[in-house]
C-alpha cells in the first residue's frame, strides 16, 4: 500500500549541508504552523516554537550548542533557520509533546522541498544560566525546557538512499 503521505515519510532524510539561500517566509510560516497541530498530552499544548532567523541569535544559539557538544563547529550545519522547540517542564509529557512538534515540522519541510536535521542539546542549553538569560531576553517563561531543534534550509546536495531497515524492527504478537 502506498500513497503520497507514506512516500513523504519514507523519503525524508536528515540534511547536514545547506545552501545559504534564505527560506521564504511563506514556507517558514507553513512549516511552523504544522508544528502547532502536533498531538500533545491531554491537548495541553505545552510546547513553544522559536524560529531563529536573526543572525545574532543564530550565532549565539550555535555557540551555546557547540559548547555543550564540546566542539567549535556549527551544530546546525550552516542552515539559515534554526527552529527551537521548548516546552513547559511541568507538563509530564513535555518531551513527547515537543518531539511530535519537531516531527510534524520535519515532514512539512520535506513536503515543501526543504531539508531538516534534528539537533539535540537544547535541554542542556536552556537548563543553563545562559539559556535562562536568553529566555528572559525573549520574554519567555523560565519554566520552558529544551526538547530539540531542527536546522532548516535548502539542501546543498541530493539526499542519499536510506539504510536498510533492521531485522525484527516490527514484532507482531
Regions found by a protein language model. Name each.
Residues 1-173:
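Acidic, surface-exposed loops and disordered segments
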Amino acid at each position: 500500500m502506498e500513497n503520497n503521505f507514506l512516500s513523504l515519510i519514507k523519503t525524508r532524510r536528515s540534511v547536514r549541508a545547506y545552501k545559504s539561500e534564505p527560506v521564504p517566509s511563506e514556507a517558514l510560516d507553513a512549516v511552523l504552523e504544522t508544528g502547532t497541530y502536533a498531538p500533545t498530552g491531554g491537548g495541553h499544548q505545552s510546547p513553544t516554537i522559536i524560529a531563529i532567523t536573526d543572525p545574532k541569535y543564530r550565532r549565539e544559539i550555535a555557540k551555546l550548542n557547540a559548547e555543550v557538544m564540546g566542539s567549535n563547529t556549527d551544530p546546525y550545519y550552516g542552515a539559515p533557520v534554526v527552529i527551537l522547540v521548548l516546552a513547559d517542564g511541568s507538563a509530564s509529557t513535555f518531551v513527547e509533546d515537543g518531539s511530535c512538534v519537531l516531527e510534524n515540522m520535519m515532514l512539512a519541510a520535506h513536503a515543501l522541498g526543504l531539508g531538516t536535521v534534528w539537533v539535540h542539546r537544547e535541554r542542556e542549553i536552556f537548563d543553563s544560566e545562559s539559556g535562562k538569560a536568553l529566555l528572559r531576553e525573549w520574554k519567555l517563561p523560565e519554566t520552558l525546557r529544551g526538547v530539540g531543534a531542527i536546522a532548516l534550509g535548502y539542501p546543498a546536495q541530493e539526499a542519499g538512499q536510506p539504510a536498510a531497515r533492521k531485522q525484527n524492527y516490527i514484532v507482531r504478537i
